[in-house]
Amino acid sequence: MTDSAARMTAESFLSRLADRGVEYVLANAGTDFAPIIEALSRNPGSNRKYPRVITVPHENVAVAMAHGYYRVSGKPAVVMVHVTVGTANAVCALMNAARDNVPIILGAGRTPLTETGHAASRNRSIHWGQEMFDQGGLTREFVKWDYELRAGQPADSVVDRALDIAMSEPRGPVYLTLPREVLADPAVPPRRDTVRPLGASPAVPSFAAVELAAAILSAAEFPLILTSSVGRKPEAMTELAALADEFAIPVVQSEARDISLPTDHPMCLGFDPSALLAMADAVAVFDSAVPWIPRLHPLKQDAKIICFGPDPLFTRYPFREFEADLLVTGESGAALTMLRESLSHAMRGRVATIEGRRRALGEARQQMIARRKNLVEQVKDQTPIHPLYLASCLNALKAKDAIIVNELGLPVGGLDLTTPRSYLGSSLAGGLGFGLGGGLGAKLAAPEREVIAAVGDGSYYFGNPLAYHYVSRAEKLPTLTIIANNHAWHAVRQATRDVYPDGHASKANAMPLVDLNPAPDFEKVAESCAGFGEKVTTPEQLMPALRRSFDAVRSGTPALLNVTTQNRG
């Protein structure tokens, strides 16, 4: 009997994940996990390599961890959950991953297929209640592929396909269901035992399309680059910095989910596109589903729009207008390299134009810096604490390469961000709860770097804080959690005011459905999990409390600051 035939499919499944470079399985187990648990228990006596398995007591945290882990490491993680109910708990975070093009393998058990006749047949009443006609339907709109492992199939082949699809551009999550009987059955040997890079090679942009884009940008008096996440790959961040500097093209990181251009770069013109969009006669958009809000940010008449990305039409979005003059499909890092080369020819002899633009943009940047500095000075003594002052204090104390995971906690325009993969913004899906688990995943990917999870109080509720603090302690992943606590659902309040600026709700002393008082002592939640916790209510308390928090984290103790902040707007 061969080794492949002697071992269970569950063992083959775990081995193949490790063979393909998966380092972590983030798991929330149920009765469907019996073969997986048996496989893990057998492993110490074998020479088979498995990914490290981490227990995460809530599915939302587990998927958010995988999300944050990929954003910092560039590697996919696997999340395993309990049948239909675990999948349902994971779907919110799965939506976030899908809209953020994050490859995650979400694996779920399937209630046993058989009532009798197999050691893994149904033996609990829930095994009838948890079955669905179409379990994959829970996820189908937000995954690239879903499949159920079947009897007689090599687990290796299914793992390979899952990883390849997830890691092919545009990247995204996949869903795999794993029946208990199939996992317990003897493994089927793979047809081919090859290991190669994950995913299909990314498409290279059309040379002719890039040449046309260069012609449009070189003819413009005031070209502009907008991006949300092109800097997710550090090499693309380097290319963008070189292109923007060489041709004096300003960059606005609208709806930033990653830091794509260092905030100290001379062509970094902030994160709000409003003013520059009104002036730009050519706009190049890289990796941005919503580069501006059409009803709020009018474009200059006759402005030319060029959109770059692996899917510049964002075909997974049901409706998205954003009409463009040119759509360039391909990997954006490659597009930047090609565009820089094309512009070097198109802009030859245009030194005066470039340098004139550079001077004007230098003045605009200095004005932007002065405005931020003046605003910090104006608000630094205000009580409750202004979020911009909180960001300013954080800048003064954090490590240069610290990773900030920001979910409605801090104004990104107030942060100093100069290192690749140092900023993780929220997904456009808007599923609250990403910030906490995302911070753990970032720390798992880069244990040597400081990780700061900045969340609103509403986001903290949704982040399943007990599960978060448990994993932080159990896995020795000390993060600094900052809660910007305005005691309200601020986004809900602001949305109501935007739609009904003169309405009854806007004029009311207390708007329905937004108040979160009486607020808990969130810092005590961290203390209950052996962390450091402190409440901050005045500006004078902030810097000393931040220092104590950083001291705790740097010594290996998770820390949480509960900061009472202003209701903005």
Residue ranges of each PLM-predicted region?
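A glycine-rich phosphate-binding loop feature that marks nucleotide/adenosyl-phosphate handling sites
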Residues: T177-V182, G409-P411, T564-Q566
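Phosphate/pyrophosphate-binding active-site segments
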Residues: M1-S4, R150-Q153, D302-V405, A508-M511, ...
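Active-site flanking residues adjacent to catalytic metal/cofactor-binding acidic residues
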Residues: F286, F308-P310, N406, G456-D457, ...
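Thiamine diphosphate
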Residues: T116-G129, L277-M279, R320-E321, V328-T329, ...
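N-terminal alpha/beta PP-like core and its mobile active-site loop of ThDP/TPP-dependent enzymes
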Residues: T2-G349, H469, P478-T481, D502, ...
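N-terminal cationic-hydrophobic initiation segments that often serve targeting/anchoring roles
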Residues: P44, Y70, A166, A244, ...
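Short conserved AdoMet
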Residues: R171, S218, K300, A399, ...
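Active-site diphosphate/adenylate-binding microenvironment
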Residues: A10-R20, T31-L40, G362-E448
